[in-house]
Amino acid sequence: MYAFYSLLIYIFYSLFRRDGGAAAVSDPGDPTQKSGGQPRGRRRPDQFTSELWSELNSLAGCSESEDGQKGAEGGAAEVSLEEALMRLAEFLSVQLGAEESCGTTPDLGKPGEVPPLLTVTSQLLALLAWTRSPRGRQALLQGTQPTCPVQPSTLDGSLSQEESSSQPTPILDEVPRDETQEHQPLQLEEEQRVWQRLEQLILGQLEELRQQLEQQEEELSRLRLGVGVTDSEKRVQHLTLENEALKQSLSLTRDLLLHWGPGPLPRLSQEEAGALLELQGQLQEAQDTTEALRVQLGAQELQLQGLRGALRQLQQETEQNCRQELQQVHGQLAGLRARMASLRQGCGDLRGLVSTFTQSCQGSLSEAQGQVSWALGALSAGKAKTQLSEGNQAPPTGCSGRLLELKGNIRVLCRLRPAEGQPSSLVSVEPGQGGTITTCYRGRQHCFRLDWVFPQDASQEEVFRQLEPAVLSCLQGYSVCIFTYGQTGTGKTYSMEGPPEDPGIAPRALQLLFREMGTGGHHHVTLSMVEIYNEAVRDLLATGPPERLVVRQGPAGQGGIQVAGLTHWDVPNLETLHQMLSLGRSNRATAATVMNQHSSRSHALVTLTLRAASPPRPQGITGTLHLVDLAGSERVWKAGVASPVQRDPNGARRLREAQAINRSLLALGGVMAALRARRPHVPFRDSQLTRLLQPALWAGTTAVLLLQISTRAEDLGETICSLKFAERVGQVELGPARRRRAPRSGTPSSLSTDTPLTGTSCTPTPSPGSPPSTSPNSCSGLTLEPPGDPPP
């Protein structure tokens, strides 16, 4: 914008300097303004730029030709008119192109849409074109005042009217000098009128510029109230540039008026001069306001930067504080979690103390009841001393009950197989109650302490004497389980069954029970015998071929298990019982291995149910005796079943049997570990063996483990494993033994919530004999019954 005004002022300066600074008056009769002898009409606003450009080019050509002729007189100009006009025209083209590119191309067909800058520029170019014409030169030489055209259309219209009315001759020199002087006053008057009219138009243009200035000031005042600092700054800059442009235009117009007017413009009235001064004051005020706004904008920018910095710092501080608070909350949460864990542990410890205290109280109560029963039993034994012929062989029933309770619910007895030849020095034994077994294996010494350790030369009678109190407790309504455990070939079946000339635990226990029942009231004995072979349950007392039985959980509310298809035999006397046991032993699966010629390949379970009822009461107590002969744990490479093709055609079967035996014994170890740790879930369902032993290993029962070990050096590793298992089993606590009532439905029951063990003795009564018969009941489900009173 400033470059344009500088260029424009430079053009006029050069022009006035070349022409001597003289003024000119437009001649309405100039023949050079004609085009082909025809008067020109008013040009349309949209044709102004192109026509004006053509006129400027023609005028530039004329100027160059004339300047060439008068070069000697006037001298060369500082800048050519053609170059100045080209610069001015290029600026106008760029200005119009910029407006078109911004999407604000003015409609030149409407007078209100023409920009003021373009209007003023057009007026100046029109004036410049007139001064370069021959008539303008003549007017300048005469020193008359020009009628500066404000609008090209006005100038063109006036020129056209003058041309059409005057009809000048093509040769100006031929006009006489006197005639020219005669017409000069008329010309001056007419030109004076034209000058006044053009002066009014210029004053109107000045008023329009003043109004635009006021609009810009109003726009500037509106921008002061705006919120967006960046947009306001851009708008202020734009308005400042427009304000400068308007000031330059106003100054240029004022200078032109002063230069072309008659001296110091004597014709301007005081009001016009005051208006001009007022406009100048408003312009100065607008400049001051713009500068103040610029200063205020800078201050606001600084304030905004400060606010942004403060906001950024506040955000950082808030974020840091939130992170610190979050870390503190996490730390407090971790502390609360640790506190909660400690409280839970303390609660568990308190529960354990309460449980221990409860058990201690129950134990003290049971001990007191046992002492009372001991006294009553001793009194009864003193009265019946003369009536018992074999009183010295077995202790009274009350004594056995108290002794069983004092020794604990689970006892571990250990029996060593007699060594063949020289005894091994790797195993040392301290027999007796609380005896120890010390082994030396791979340079390390292991010591195990058990409830009772038998010497190597212990007889079957000595072994049974330790189990006799537990067997007799069945007559009082308790559930007892005796099972043998150990490596294959260590004598488990020998200790449980024994030969006919030296019977084992099972024949002696049955003989003792029938002897005691023969002197008491009415007793009903039921027998069942099963084996677990390759995880299949088979009935050893079935009349037909053995079938695989299905083990199910008992009905809801009754507990226990049920074996569908299992037969229960009523046993009237001892002879029938021995016959049935012989039948079951003959049906059991046995085979020869490298370690044992008569190795049991299955687990055998004999269940004897005793129900006794006094004549006054229809419902009596029920006791259960479980005799379990477990198959021996074996290592397949030692038993000779690792390569079945080379050793035995049935080696594959022996291998499957060994794998099934080891898996079931491993499941039994898991059950014992869960019972020892008092876990809420005991994995009885991991094996068929543990499922059948669930009634015998539940709370309130009595269990006795007879461990069979070997003292041979090659069996020392398996012996240590068996001793470790027995030591863990000895730590299992099943709780106080409880008595059980017989169910009303007649189904054999194996476990219920009963009264604690007491030393009350049973009076033997003869039992009527009856032939063996098959019980209609076909399951061994266990029914829970409420506790009942002991028999009188």
From Swiss-Prot:
User: What is the top-level taxon of the source organism?
Assistant: Eukaryota
Q: Which CDD domains match?
A: KISc_C_terminal
Compositionally biased tracts (Low complexity): 744-764
GO terms for cellular component? cytoplasm; microtubule
| Limits of the Kinesin motor domain | 409-732
Region annotation Disordered: where it falls in the sequence: 22-45, 142-184, 734-792
* Chief place where the protein resides: cytoplasm
The protein's matches in PANTHER family, at most eight in alphabetical order, are given as: KINESIN-LIKE PROTEIN KIFC3, KINESIN-LIKE PROTEIN KLP-3
Family indicated by similarity: Belongs to the TRAFAC class myosin-kinesin ATPase superfamily. Kinesin family.
> What task does this protein carry out?
May play a role in microtubule-dependent retrograde axonal transport. May function as the motor for the transport of multivesicular body (MVB)-like organelles in dendrites.
Name it.
Kinesin-like protein KIFC2
What is the scientific name of the source organism? Answer: Mus musculus (Mouse)
